[in-house]
Design a protein with these regions (language model features):
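Transmembrane helix-bundle core of multi-pass membrane transporters
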Residues: 123, 127-130, 134-189, 218-219, ...
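Short loop segments and helix-boundary regions at transmembrane helix junctions
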Residues: 64-69, 110-150, 160, 240-244, ...
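Alpha-helical transmembrane segments within multi-pass membrane transporters and channels
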Residues: 59, 92-132, 137, 178-179, ...
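Single transmembrane alpha-helix segments in multi-pass membrane proteins
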Residues: 40-93, 98, 114-119, 259-266
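Transmembrane alpha-helical segments in multi-pass inner-membrane proteins
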Residues: 228-303
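Helix-loop-helix "hairpin" substructures at the membrane interface of multi-pass membrane proteins
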Residues: 108, 163-251, 256
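Membrane-interfacial amphipathic/re-entrant helices at transmembrane-helix boundaries
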Residues: 23, 27-55, 83, 90-96, ...
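Cytosolic-side transmembrane-helix boundaries in multi-pass membrane proteins
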Residues: 183, 201-208, 212-215, 268, ...
Length: 331
């Protein structure tokens, strides 16, 4: 079968496009999975993985370091896309929109933290409340449920004119993802960061030493949602639109990426946890891409992701229960 080049990579004839501006994969029976197809799968997975790595990195800060089940993520991701889309449509530079998305994402995370620490609202409920409020805020920002950016200048417009578009876009996402990872490591390793990690592990001990864990929680959630909002702003520009539903299931996808990464890297330190978020994001997107190529319906992706997380979280408990039963039986 002959193939023809495309913007995203190798596109065999009679192929079904995947993920819009990405690579197209063959759907005809008997088509040989050649090196070009493998390269295409790798390219789109790496590009998408690095684009969403900031979501996983933000969830690492809230779930792993702060031990705070923050559900604001689904709303703050859309917030980033909505802010950037609105700013670009109004004629502002894309970089200004990205900066504002970071600021507002940080504010959204801090709001969740303040509801929990000042008003003593349950952590899950605090996240749900802010996420619900953000739904209306995002609609107000965009003015409608979907804002296309195809005909506007974005941060990725200069890459469209280059032959190695995929390479430059991947390097761009990679630089941002690893830059945020190293900044997170620098924040965590000094004394404030050690307090954050201890806050999640033993809050009563830190309070007994006179440390204000409430401030740590608010700051940590702000940083977490700033990362997520930044990711939303970049993804909206990359895919060419911002949509009110683009954040649905984002927290589950981020958790899946973290679980995969921590399993592969056996992450037991903060630096490994942040690296696991990036690696896991790539592997997760690789799994999704391969699943789509094999015929998995796009409508089933959320269900498959949820099942993956349930399996990963439930297996250790089942294993421990089995070992305890064997121990009681004297086996």
């Amino acid at each position: 079968m002959k193939g023809s080049p495309s913007k995203g990579g190798f596109c065999p004839d009679a192929a079904t496009p995947l993920l819009g501006r990405g690579v197209a994969f063959p759907r005809e029976s008997g088509c040989v999975l050649g090196m070009n197809i493998l390269l295409g799968i790798f390219q789109i997975s790496l590009e998408q993985g690095l684009a969403y790595a900031l979501v996983a990195l933000g969830i690492v800060v809230s779930f792993r370091i702060l031990a705070f089940p923050d559900l604001t993520v689904d709303g703050s991701f859309v917030l980033g896309g909505a802010v950037v889309a609105r700013m670009i449509v109004l004629g502002y530079p894309p970089l200004a929109g990205v900066f504002l998305s970071i600021v507002l994402g940080f504010a959204a995370g801090c709001a969740t933290g303040l509801l929990n620490t000042r008003l003593r609202i349950n952590s899950l409920l605090a996240g749900i409340l802010i996420m619900t409020i953000l739904y209306s805020v995002n609609l107000r920002l965009m003015g409608r449920s979907n804002t296309p950016l195809i005909n506007y200048t974005t941060l990725f417009t200069p890459f469209e004119e280059t032959e190695a578009r995929w390479l430059w876009v991947t390097l761009f996402f990679g630089a941002i993802a690893f830059g945020c990872k190293f900044q997170t490591d620098q924040i965590i390793h000094p004394q404030l960061g050690l307090d954050k990690r201890a806050k999640g592990a033993n809050e009563q001990m830190k309070r007994s030493q006179g440390l204000n864990t409430d401030h740590i929680t608010v700051l940590g959630l702000g940083i977490s949602n700033a990362f997520v909002s930044l990711s939303g702003g970049l993804v909206a520009q990359h895919q060419g639109f911002a949509d009110i539903g683009m954040g649905i299931g984002m927290i589950v996808a981020g958790l899946a990426a973290i679980i995969i990464g921590e399993t592969l890297l056996r992450a037991k330190t903060v630096m490994r946890n942040t690296l696991a978020a990036i690696v896991g994001s790539f592997v997760y997107r690789l799994t999704i891409t391969v699943g789509l190529w094999l015929g998995l319906a796009p409508t089933d992706l959320k269900m498959a992701t949820g099942a993956m997380v349930i399996l990963a979280l439930g297996l250790p408990a089942l294993k421990r229960g089995k070992e305890e039963r064997f121990h009681l039986r004297g086996i």
